[in-house]
């Protein structure tokens, strides 16, 4: 949040009760009383040549590997959970696209632009940031792209 304050980017921080069994983004949206489509989970992926990518997608959907291969030009897979903290500085359920250990190429699903504000992790379990999509894009030097496929019903 210091990064946002230093850049004079407005945001609101929301807190919620969390537990190990309900760390998923849809459960978090329910706890906050917000539409799941406005809560963007942070997915960290890696290519065969160890390039790390960050994707922010709405809670109810999944990253389309076909689409991200088309966007990045690389076949990528999710980063192993054991490597998440060492790579990003964050843990599962508290991984924010803002303030990672290093700058990684970041993409935000284009649906974020439909909302005045979206929610992303504040970098720790139990805290979410409410931020304008354009401000998130600016602070992360991200691109808006079509990244998702509908979640299996």
Identify the function of each model-found stretch:
Residues 1-153:
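Extended, low-hydrophobicity, polar/charged segments
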């Amino acid at each position: 949040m210091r990064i946002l304050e230093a850049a004079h980017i407005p945001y609101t921080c929301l807190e919620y009760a969390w537990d190990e069994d309900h760390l998923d983004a849809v459960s978090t949206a329910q706890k906050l009383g917000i539409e799941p489509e406005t809560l963007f989970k942070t997915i960290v992926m890696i290519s065969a040549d160890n390039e790390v990518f960050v994707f922010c997608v709405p809670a109810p959907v999944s990253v389309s590997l076909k689409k991200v291969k088309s966007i990045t030009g690389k076949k990528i897979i999710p980063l192993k959970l054991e490597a998440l903290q060492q790579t990003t500085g964050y843990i599962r359920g508290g991984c924010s696209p803002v303030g990672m250990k290093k700058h990684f190429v970041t993409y935000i699903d284009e649906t974020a632009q439909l909302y005045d504000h979206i929610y992303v992790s504040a970098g720790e379990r139990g805290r979410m940031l409410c931020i304008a999509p354009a401000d998130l894009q600016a602070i992360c030097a991200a691109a808006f792209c079509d990244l998702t496929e509908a979640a299996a019903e």
